[in-house]
Amino acid sequence: MPDKKGSADAKVLHCSFCNKSQHEVRKLIAGPSVFICDECIDLCNDIIREEAQATARAAIRSELPTPSEIKTFLDQYVIGQTLPKRMLAVAVYNHYKRIRHGEIKGDEVELSKSNIMLIGPTGSGKTLLAQTLARMLNVPFVMADATTLTEAGYVGEDVENIIQKLLQNCNYEVEKAQRAIIYIDEIDKISRKSDNPSITRDVSGEGVQQALLKLIEGTVASVPPQGGRKHPNQDFVQVDTTNILFIVGGAFDGLEKVIRDRTEKSGIGFSASVRAKSERGVGELFSEVEPEDLIKFGLIPELVGRLPVVATLDELDEAALVQILTEPKNSLIKQFQKLFAMEGAELDVRPGALKAIARKALKRKTGARGLRSIIEAALLDTMYDLPSQGNVSRVVLDENVIDSDGKPLLIYADEAAAPDKPARSQVRGAAA
């Protein structure tokens, strides 16, 4: 009898870590000469999870650039616009800091999202700012045109197509897509057409604003897999937009009149500063924009409330356009010089030509966006002939080529090898 009792006691197994018997725990898992209970497994999982979260937080902290570093990077590609760049840098830094904060469980303080609105004239750098931010942060980026959007059920793109395009850019990696930056251009073009209700439905104006509302605030969007059409009884890809940073931009033509009317009404009396309307530029007026101005312009109050960071961009003057032509890392002049270098020729753009290009862009009122077309037109014939000539060592672009539609001066590598002396002198005369 004692032998049987002893053998029974010997069969009771214990956890090798906490020493609890198999009767004290729910499950005991055996290994080579060791045992572990379910309680110890849960404890180990908690330890590993906490360490993984700490490592992830440290990685995000080390990868996330400071606002000053973000602005310094933007300075390399975007000329001027100091205040908008500072505002963007702080907003983007706080946004990704908010995402990191959300990963810490147990914190009672919930940080809300600060989406961004960029207001500025055509060609002032709104799109470039958003693209440069995404490139620096190494996050997915997608750009949408608000003018192509319509309410769901009508001909055109609905707002969920933006998320579908984002997923395509991320190869359908949902986790990656949920930390992206989405830039919606021409947001001013979907303003309410009229303050008065109409019997006809505004499917591309206020209707689109209402559709964008939940997307910008944060919702779970259902997107068809692999870009297919929506139909019943199919599985959808679920994308949470809570941590997606939305940047919207627009030229807002006519907003300056709304701001001017408001500010001039308040500037009445003996202490009011009297200034002619022509003295105040569009950029200066935009800097005084208030939410009520945007609502009067035609944006619905709910949408304005979900875009708390409003950055206004200045008009670009001649000096700024000359800087844009030469100073950024990927400036237009450097790009064309690279193209000519591939043909074995040096492109020499004189300072007078740079100013003439800037003046022509200002006259066309296209901002920085119109610079490329001016240079392309001036160099078209040269770029057409250069590959077949092969012995041109230098191309000189001066002021007369831009202002008088002349031809650039071609300098050949070998005077004796020049195909036609009179033709060369004619080219020189045209550029002189």
UniProtKB/Swiss-Prot annotation:
UniProt GO molecular function: ATP binding; ATP hydrolysis activity; ATP-dependent protein folding chaperone; protein dimerization activity; unfolded protein binding; zinc ion binding
Stretches assigned to the ClpX-type ZB domain: 3-56
Pfam family, one: zf-C4_ClpX
Entry's Gene Ontology BP terms: cell division; proteolysis involved in protein catabolic process
Keywords for this protein: ATP-binding, Chaperone, Metal-binding, Nucleotide-binding, Zinc
List of residues binding Zn(2+): C15, C18, C37, C40
Superkingdom, taxonomy of origin: Bacteria
Residues given in the record as ATP binding sites: P121, T122, G123, S124, G125, K126, T127, L128
GO cellular component term of the entry, any: HslUV protease complex
InterPro entries: AAA+_ATPase, ATP-dep_Clp_protease_ClpX, ATPase_AAA_core, Clp_ATPase_C, Clp_protease_ATP-bd_su_ClpX, ClpX_bact, P-loop_NTPase, Znf_CppX_C4
NCBIfam families according to UniProt: clpX, PRK05342.1
HAMAP family: ClpX
Quaternary state and interactors: Component of the ClpX-ClpP complex. Forms a hexameric ring that, in the presence of ATP, binds to fourteen ClpP subunits assembled into a disk-like structure with a central cavity, resembling the structure of eukaryotic proteasomes.
Free-text function comment from the UniProt entry: ATP-dependent specificity component of the Clp protease. It directs the protease to specific substrates. Can perform chaperone functions in the absence of ClpP.
Family under the similarity heading: Belongs to the ClpX chaperone family.
Name of the protein: ATP-dependent Clp protease ATP-binding subunit ClpX
